[in-house]
Structure formats: structure tokens, C-alpha cells
């Protein structure tokens, strides 16, 4: 089965949304267990920290999104943001690159990672 690929900004947004709803569910679980005060307090704090982490992540996504290069996807013709050397179109998952050396090569997330070796 082929692994589904997603745009980097959308993956971060999905994680932040999971943290918000997960935090609310954890806090709701704390309310259901209010007869056990220690467990309730722990669940409320964990849920609150999850919501705070989500807020920080949304803030970082916003900062990163403003610095991303905006390009027009050659496949669907819509504007999308590219983070790093390679990324996927937000609309049609078309592989995009800003590096001319990577044009025509198979899409791989490893192209965005910095290697410790000196470039040749």
C-alpha cells in the first residue's frame, strides 16, 4: 500500500488540530472523573498543556507560512507554498521543487535534510 504524502504546512496544521481536540477530550475525561480529585487535576493540566502546545504550534505555523515561497503548481494551476527544497502542492499533491538540480528526480523528503558531509 502506497504511503499517503501531504504538504508540510498541512501536516503541522493537522497535528495542531489534533492537539486542540485531544486536549479538550482529555479535559472532558477529567470532568467525568471528578470524584477522583487527583486524577481530575492531572487530566485537566495535561489537557491544558495540549491546548497550549497547539496554540504555540499554530503560532509557529503562521510565522513559517509567511516566509514560505509562493509558487503556482504546474499540475492544477493553483498557488501553493513551498517549504524547503522539495514539497507537495497543497491542492493536488504534485511534487514541487525550488532546486533546479532536483528537477525530474523522484520525490523524496530526504532532500530537505541537511547532510553532515560537505557538498561536492
Curated annotation (Swiss-Prot):
- The disulfide bonds in this chain are none
Q: Domain of life, per the record?
A: Bacteria
Q: Which GO terms describe its cellular component?
A: plasma membrane
Q: Which residues cross the membrane?
A: 16-36, 41-61
Q: Where in the cell is it found?
A: Cell membrane
Q: What membrane topology does the annotation report for this chain? A: Multi-pass membrane protein
Q: Which family does it belong to?
A: Belongs to the UPF0295 family.
Q: What is this protein called?
A: UPF0295 protein Exig_0660
- Per the UniProt record, the source organism is Exiguobacterium sibiricum (strain DSM 17290 / CCUG 55495 / CIP 109462 / JCM 13490 / 255-15)
